[in-house]
Amino acid sequence: MEVITDRLDDIVKQNIADEKFVDFVIHGLEHQCPAILRPLIRLFIDILLFVIVIYIFTVRLVSRNYQMLLALVALVITLTIFYYFIL
């Protein structure tokens, strides 16, 4: 149990360090642009980070659960065929 808590503590510390680095990079990018464009740069970076997180989550979800997702797709197709052709 101690190994797991130590690993979780290491992950938390690494996440904090990564967040500080990303904030440093974003701050540097913001100050290279005119003041009018800074909110747009922040918005673009936030959207980009959001898309990256969604992509990573989707790849992980599909790679770990592809059998269940295929069964779900087959079920939806079957129910759609039943709905349109039988009823």
Swiss-Prot record:
The chain crosses the membrane at residues 39-59, 67-87. It is found in: Virion membrane; Host cytoplasm; Host endoplasmic reticulum membrane. Induction: Expressed in the early phase of the viral replicative cycle. Keywords: Early protein, Host cytoplasm, Host endoplasmic reticulum, Host membrane, Membrane, Transmembrane, Transmembrane helix, Virion. InterPro entries: Prot_L2. It is a multi-pass membrane protein. GO terms for cellular component: host cell endoplasmic reticulum membrane; membrane; virion membrane. It comes from the Viruses. Belongs to the orthopoxvirus OPG096 family. Interacts with OPG158/A30.5. Early protein involved in virion morphogenesis. Participates in the formation and elongation of crescent-shaped membrane precursors of immature virions in cytoplasmic factories. This is Protein OPG096. It comes from Vaccinia virus (strain Western Reserve). The gene is OPG096.
